[in-house]
Amino acid sequence: MNRKITFIRVCYWVCAIFELLAVIPMLSPKLFGVIMGIRDFNPGYDYRYAMGVAASFALGWVLLLFWAARKPAERKGVLLLTIVPVFTGNMLSGIYAVSSGLLKAATVFPSLVMQVLIIVAFGLGYFYAGKLEK
Protein backbone atom coordinates (compact mmCIF):
# COMPACT_ATOMS: atom_id res chain seq x y z
CA MET A 1 0.00 0.00 0.00
CA ASN A 2 1.20 3.49 -0.77
CA ARG A 3 2.84 5.14 2.25
CA LYS A 4 1.10 8.46 1.56
CA ILE A 5 -2.31 6.80 1.56
CA THR A 6 -1.41 5.01 4.79
CA PHE A 7 -0.32 8.30 6.36
CA ILE A 8 -3.58 10.01 5.40
CA ARG A 9 -5.64 7.06 6.65
CA VAL A 10 -3.77 7.05 9.99
CA CYS A 11 -4.44 10.80 10.31
CA TYR A 12 -8.17 10.21 9.89
CA TRP A 13 -8.22 7.34 12.39
CA VAL A 14 -6.15 9.10 15.06
CA CYS A 15 -8.28 12.22 14.81
CA ALA A 16 -11.49 10.17 14.93
CA ILE A 17 -10.32 8.43 18.11
CA PHE A 18 -9.34 11.73 19.78
CA GLU A 19 -12.67 13.25 18.77
CA LEU A 20 -14.55 10.24 20.09
CA LEU A 21 -12.71 10.56 23.42
CA ALA A 22 -13.66 14.26 23.53
CA VAL A 23 -17.34 13.33 23.39
CA ILE A 24 -17.21 11.60 26.79
CA PRO A 25 -16.64 14.76 28.87
CA MET A 26 -19.16 16.58 26.68
CA LEU A 27 -21.80 14.20 27.96
CA SER A 28 -20.55 14.22 31.56
CA PRO A 29 -20.28 17.72 33.05
CA LYS A 30 -18.69 16.30 36.21
CA LEU A 31 -15.91 14.65 34.20
CA PHE A 32 -15.52 17.81 32.11
CA GLY A 33 -15.03 19.83 35.32
CA VAL A 34 -12.41 17.40 36.61
CA ILE A 35 -10.48 17.37 33.32
CA MET A 36 -10.60 21.15 32.96
CA GLY A 37 -9.78 21.85 36.59
CA ILE A 38 -13.07 23.60 37.36
CA ARG A 39 -14.01 22.87 40.97
CA ASP A 40 -17.63 22.02 41.73
CA PHE A 41 -18.63 22.33 38.08
CA ASN A 42 -22.40 21.94 38.02
CA PRO A 43 -23.81 23.64 34.94
CA GLY A 44 -27.46 24.25 34.28
CA TYR A 45 -29.74 22.66 31.74
CA ASP A 46 -28.77 25.23 29.12
CA TYR A 47 -25.15 24.04 29.19
CA ARG A 48 -26.20 20.38 29.18
CA TYR A 49 -28.44 21.00 26.17
CA ALA A 50 -25.72 22.88 24.27
CA MET A 51 -23.16 20.17 25.00
CA GLY A 52 -25.63 17.48 23.93
CA VAL A 53 -26.00 19.24 20.60
CA ALA A 54 -22.21 19.66 20.35
CA ALA A 55 -21.69 15.97 21.17
CA SER A 56 -24.09 15.02 18.37
CA PHE A 57 -22.06 17.06 15.90
CA ALA A 58 -18.81 15.62 17.26
CA LEU A 59 -20.10 12.07 16.82
CA GLY A 60 -21.17 12.94 13.29
CA TRP A 61 -17.67 14.22 12.62
CA VAL A 62 -16.20 10.98 13.98
CA LEU A 63 -18.30 9.02 11.49
CA LEU A 64 -17.27 11.40 8.71
CA LEU A 65 -13.59 10.81 9.55
CA PHE A 66 -14.06 7.02 9.50
CA TRP A 67 -15.87 7.35 6.16
CA ALA A 68 -13.09 9.52 4.73
CA ALA A 69 -10.47 6.99 5.86
CA ARG A 70 -11.99 4.42 3.50
CA LYS A 71 -10.96 6.51 0.46
CA PRO A 72 -8.42 8.93 1.93
CA ALA A 73 -7.17 10.66 -1.21
CA GLU A 74 -10.56 10.94 -2.88
CA ARG A 75 -12.08 12.48 0.25
CA LYS A 76 -9.21 14.85 0.98
CA GLY A 77 -11.64 17.76 1.37
CA VAL A 78 -12.49 16.37 4.81
CA LEU A 79 -8.89 17.12 5.81
CA LEU A 80 -9.35 20.83 5.09
CA LEU A 81 -12.76 20.94 6.75
CA THR A 82 -11.19 19.42 9.84
CA ILE A 83 -8.48 22.09 9.90
CA VAL A 84 -10.95 24.95 9.35
CA PRO A 85 -13.43 25.33 10.99
CA VAL A 86 -13.20 22.35 13.38
CA PHE A 87 -9.74 22.54 14.93
CA THR A 88 -9.13 26.22 14.30
CA GLY A 89 -12.44 26.94 16.04
CA ASN A 90 -11.56 24.64 18.94
CA MET A 91 -8.21 26.38 19.36
CA LEU A 92 -9.82 29.82 19.35
CA SER A 93 -12.34 28.62 21.94
CA GLY A 94 -9.52 27.36 24.14
CA ILE A 95 -7.66 30.65 23.84
CA TYR A 96 -10.85 32.50 24.74
CA ALA A 97 -11.39 30.25 27.78
CA VAL A 98 -7.90 31.12 29.05
CA SER A 99 -8.13 34.84 28.27
CA SER A 100 -11.51 35.09 30.03
CA GLY A 101 -10.15 33.38 33.13
CA LEU A 102 -12.40 30.32 32.85
CA LEU A 103 -9.50 27.91 32.37
CA LYS A 104 -5.81 27.92 33.23
CA ALA A 105 -3.32 27.99 30.36
CA ALA A 106 -1.70 24.82 31.70
CA THR A 107 -5.04 23.02 31.36
CA VAL A 108 -5.62 24.11 27.76
CA PHE A 109 -2.01 23.83 26.55
CA PRO A 110 -1.95 20.03 25.96
CA SER A 111 -5.13 20.27 23.90
CA LEU A 112 -3.72 23.15 21.85
CA VAL A 113 -0.52 21.19 21.16
CA MET A 114 -2.53 18.16 20.03
CA GLN A 115 -4.68 20.34 17.78
CA VAL A 116 -1.64 22.00 16.20
CA LEU A 117 -0.13 18.56 15.53
CA ILE A 118 -3.37 17.40 13.91
CA ILE A 119 -3.55 20.56 11.80
CA VAL A 120 0.03 20.03 10.58
CA ALA A 121 -0.58 16.33 9.90
CA PHE A 122 -3.84 17.04 8.07
CA GLY A 123 -2.18 19.79 6.03
CA LEU A 124 0.57 17.37 5.05
CA GLY A 125 -2.04 14.72 4.28
CA TYR A 126 -3.88 17.14 2.01
CA PHE A 127 -0.61 17.92 0.23
CA TYR A 128 0.09 14.19 -0.22
CA ALA A 129 -3.42 13.58 -1.54
CA GLY A 130 -2.90 16.31 -4.13
CA LYS A 131 0.33 14.64 -5.25
CA LEU A 132 -1.47 11.31 -5.64
CA GLU A 133 -3.98 12.82 -8.06
CA LYS A 134 -1.27 13.85 -10.52
Regions picked out by a protein language model, each given a short descriptive name:
Residues 1-19:
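Cytosolic juxtamembrane helix and N-cap/initiation of the first transmembrane helix
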Residues 32, 61-71, 91-99:
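Membrane-helix exit/interface motif
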Residues 116-134:
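Membrane-water interface at the C-terminal end of transmembrane alpha helices
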Residues 38-45, 102-114:
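Non-cytosolic membrane-interface motifs at loop->transmembrane helix junctions
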Residues 2-5, 28-51:
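Interfacial loop at the N-terminal end of multi-pass membrane proteins
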Residues 17-21, 25-26, 45-67, 81-88:
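Core segments of alpha-helical transmembrane spans in multipass integral membrane proteins
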Residues 79-95, 114-121:
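Hydrophobic alpha-helical membrane segments
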Residues 91-111, 127-128:
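Membrane-helix boundary connector in multi-pass membrane proteins
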